Amino acid sequence: KCAKAIDQILHTPVSGYFYGINTTLEKAVVIEACKLGLHITTAESCTGGLAAGAITAVPGSSAVFDGGVVTYSNDMKKKLLGVRDETLRDFGAVSPETAGEMALGAIKLTGADIAVSVTGIAGPGGGTEEKPVGLVYIAAASKAGVTDHPSHPVLCHPSASVCSHFTSGDTDVTVLRCQFSDSRERVRTLSVKSALA
C-alpha cells in the first residue's frame, strides 16, 4: 500500500514538475515508444530543435526517432510542413491552428505515428497584449488508433489547458495552450518538457 501511494505521489505533476525514479522524461518517452513500436517526430519553432535534441540524447532513440524539423520562419512552416497561408494570415504563427497544422505536416513529412509541435513567443521581446511573451501552443498528433495521448494529454504545467481537438483524415490532434513566465531559456525548457509529457 505504502509503495503504491509513494509511486502515485512521485508520478503526479506538482507545480509544473514531474517526479520519477531512475529515469528522465525523455528516456521514458523513448522507452514507451520502443515498447509500443511507434515512431515519433517533432516540428519546432520557438524551441529551435531542443525537443529533438532531448529525444536524441537518449541512447537507442534511433529506434523510434527518424527526425524532426525546425521551422522558425513562416516560410519554412509553409514549405516543409504545409502550414496554409490563410492559417498564418488569419491566426498567426503563434496559434492553436498553426500548431495543429505543424504537427499534421510533421506526420505527413516523416511518416511517424506520433508528432509533437511547438510554436510560441519565447521572449524577451515580441509579445503583445493578445499574445504575451511566454505564450506557447503545443500540438500532439497521432494516427487514429495508435495511442490515446492526444485525446488525453498530460497537463504538465499549471498554465496548460486543452484549447483545440480535431481529426484530420486518420490523424487525431490535440493542442495545448501554455503561458510560461521567466527567461527565454526557461520558456523554451518548459515548452520541451510539456511537449514530451
Q: Model-found features: residue ranges?
A:
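Short alpha-helical segments enriched in small residues
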Residues: 2, 6-197
